[in-house]
Amino acid sequence: VYKRQSFTVPEGIVKISVTQHLGSGEARPGNLDLGIFDERGAGFEGPGFRGWSGGARRSFEIGETEATPGYLAGRINPGRWTVIQMSTTAGRTTDWTLKITLTEGPRAKKNSPRRRTRLRN
């Protein structure tokens, strides 16, 4: 069973943090999987896919220059982003809360192009 939680990212955001809190109905670790898609769409084979950790993590972060393993760092563009949660325990209900934190800050500076220098003997 897939559940999608869309949220709006305004201009000026440099990091997204997502934490999943599970209630007392949890059967075993890893029965709730997490992933995220950016403003380009929430299709698994589409350009908006930014990461998936399955049930290996209960939280992740995506920033412009760093991200939790399993997720892609890069510019945090404004628009509608989507966290997807999948239950791998059929017929079982679990209380859960999703906390999404958006961090504002200055954009990462782009690296200036490097000039090639030839060494001569």
Model feature map: region roles:
Residues 1-2:
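Short, small-residue-biased leader/transition segments that mark boundaries at the very start
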Residues 21-68, 78, 88-95, 100, ...:
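Surface-exposed beta-strand/loop patches in noncatalytic accessory domains
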Residues 102-120:
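Low-complexity, Pro/Ser/Thr- and charge-rich linker/hinge segments at domain boundaries
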